[in-house]
Amino acid sequence: MIYESTRDINRKLNPSEAILQGLSEEGGLFVLRDLGKNKLDLENLIGKSYYEVAEAVLRLFVDFSDEEIKECVEQAYRGKFSHENITPLVELKDGHVLELFNGPTSAFKDVGLSLLPQLTKTALTKVEDKNDILILTATSGDTGKAALEGFKDVDRTKIMVFYPNDGVSTVQKTQMQTQEGKNTKVCAIHGNFDDAQSGIKELFVDEEFKKELLSKNIKLSSANSINIGRLIPQVVYYVVSYLDLVNTNKIKLNDKVNFVVPTGNFGNILAGYYAEQIGLPVNKLICASNNNNVLYDFLTTGVYDKNRDFLKTVSPSMDILISSNLERLLYYVSGCDNDYIAKLMKDLKETGRFEVTGDVLAKIKDKFIAGFADDEQTKETIKAIYEKDNYLLDTHTAVAYKVFLENLDNEHASIVLSTASPYKFTESVYSSLFETQGEDEFTLMNKLHEQTKVVIPENLRDLDKKEIRHKDVINKEDMKKYILEKLGDL
C-alpha cells in the first residue's frame, strides 16, 4: 500500500509516513493510486457498530495491524461523543439529516480529529521516528478547535492553530481562545482563511524552515484535511449512514443514495467520493456552497477562478476560495495524471484560475451536482425547517438543506450532512427565528434554548466564563517568525 503525491509520481510514502508528513515536499497531496482496488463487504457490515465499520474502512487505507486499528478507534471515540451511535441519522419530512456534531467541540471535524492523533501516535511508533511532530493548522472556525482538543497533551506532539481574526463566529473564537493543554498555541491573523491556509502550505515547502525545525528535533505535519489521516475517518460516516438506511428498511442493500454536503475546502464531500470508490452505492454527491461559490462555478463550467471578492457570510466555515481537496478529485478523474495536476495547480498559484474540459469535466459532472444559497436563503431555510419539522439547523446545514430541496429526487434516498451544532452560530440561527435586541451570542444561546428546548452541548455551556488563554494576533506575513518564537512555549 503506497501513497504518492498528486503532483509527482516519484514522491511515494507508506501510509504511516504519509500521515506524519501531511503534505508532499513540492505541495502535492498524498493519494492512493489504486484507490478502489479493494472494496468493503457491505453485506457483512449490516448491523455492525460504528467502531466495527470504522475498523473495516481503515484497513483499506493504513498499514496498521488489526489490533492497532481497533485500539485507535476505541481511543478516538469511546466515551467522547454524546450519542452512542457517534453520527446518528435523523429522519425529517423530506429527507434524512446525518448529525456529525456530537463530538467534543460540536462540529463534524471531531470525527476526523479525534482519530488523527491516534493514527499519528501509532504511525510514529511504526516508522521509529525520534522527532516530535508540530501540527500546523489553518482554520475557518471548526477545524482549529477540534484539532486542539484532539491533540491536547498528546505525547510527542505540539499544535499551533491560525484563524482569521474577523472570520469566525464569537463561539468559535472563544472555543479556541480558551483552549487548555501544555502543547497548544492559538493565534489570529489579519486576513481570511485562504491567507492562513496559503501561509501554512508555503511553510510546508520551505526547506530552510523545515531544517531549522529539524535542528530542534521537530517535524511538520497538518491536521487539515490535506492530511490523508484527517480525510480517511470521514469516509466512515458515509458508510454508517448508508447502512442505517438499510438497517431501518428505508432502502435495500445496493440501492444508490444521494449525499448533500455543505462544502468549503472540499474534504467532506471528497470523503463521499472515496466511499463510493471503495464500494458504497452513491448516486450523486451534491455540493452546497454559500455566496463564496467558486465550487459551484467550477462544477458547472469547469472553470475554477478565485479572482473574486471574498465574502463574509453567516456560514463562515465555508468562507473559502481555495478548496484544497479538489486537487485529489482532479487527480482521480484525470486518470492519476500527476503532470496534469501539477500544471493545474501551477496555473492556480500564478493566475488564480484553471480550467478543465472534455473527459475530466464529464466525469466530474457525472457524479457531482452543485448549488448555493445566499445568507437570506440560508436564514429562510432555518426558519422553514424549524416550523415544518421542529428541527433546528445550523447555518451551514441550512445551506445544504436549501440545495437539497432544489434537487429533490423521488427515485433515491437523500442524506444531508449536518456539520455543526446550531449553538456554534447562535446569533444567525436565533435571528432567523426570533427578533433580537442586540444581545451577545452567549445570551442568545440561552434564549435559543429557552425558545426551542434544543439542548446546548455541554462543551458550549458556560464557555463565556472560561479563562481566555490565547490572545495573539499577527500579520499573515509573520506566521513563520511567530512559530519559531513560540515553539519554546510548547
Predicted regions and their residues:
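PLP-dependent amino-acid enzyme catalytic core
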Residues: 1-490
